Amino acid sequence: MIQTQSMLDVADNSGARRVMCIKVLGGSHRRYAGIGDIIKVTVKEAIPRGKVKKGQVMTAVVVRTRHGVRRADGSIIRFDGNAAVLLNTKQEPIGTRIFGPVTRELRTEKFMKIVSLAPEVL
C-alpha cells in the first residue's frame, strides 16, 4: 500500500535510486496504490550520468510492495521492500533492464514490456 510521501526503490536502470510518491493516480481522492497502479513520483536520489536527475517529477508503476498482493487461491505474495519502475509519457519504461522479481498481476497489455524484461515473474 503506497500513499503520498511513501519512499520506494527504483527497480530499473533509469538512473534513479530512490523516489517518493507525491500522488496516487486514478480517482479524485484515491489514497493507496498497490502493485500495478500508476503513481506520480519525484526523484530523491539518483546516480551521476543517469537518464533522470534528482528533483524530476515522473510517473511510475508499482512493481513490489511490502503489503503484497492477494491471489484468487488465497495466497499472498509479499516483498521485503517497495519498488517502482519509472515510465515515460507513453507509459513505457525508461530503463532497459528491470532488477528483482515482479508479479503476474503486471501481465496486462500496458506493462508486458516490464514483464518481459524482468528476470523473474512470480
Swiss-Prot record:
Cystine bridges: none
One Gene Ontology term, aspect cellular component: cytosolic large ribosomal subunit
Ribonucleoprotein as UniProt keyword: yes
InterPro entries attached to this UniProt entry: Ribosomal_uL14, Ribosomal_uL14_bac-type, Ribosomal_uL14_CS, Ribosomal_uL14_sf
Keyword terms of this UniProt record: Ribonucleoprotein, Ribosomal protein, RNA-binding, rRNA-binding
Thylakoid among keywords: no
Top-level division of the source organism's lineage: Bacteria
Gene3D superfamilies attached to this UniProt entry: Ribosomal protein L14
NCBIfam families membership: rplN_bact (TIGR01067)
Subunit structure and binding partners: Part of the 50S ribosomal subunit. Forms a cluster with proteins L3 and L19. In the 70S ribosome, L14 and L19 interact and together make contacts with the 16S rRNA in bridges B5 and B8.
Family, per entry: Belongs to the universal ribosomal protein uL14 family.
Designated name of the protein: Large ribosomal subunit protein uL14
Species annotation: Pseudomonas putida (strain W619)
Lineage: Bacteria, Pseudomonadati, Pseudomonadota, Gammaproteobacteria, Pseudomonadales
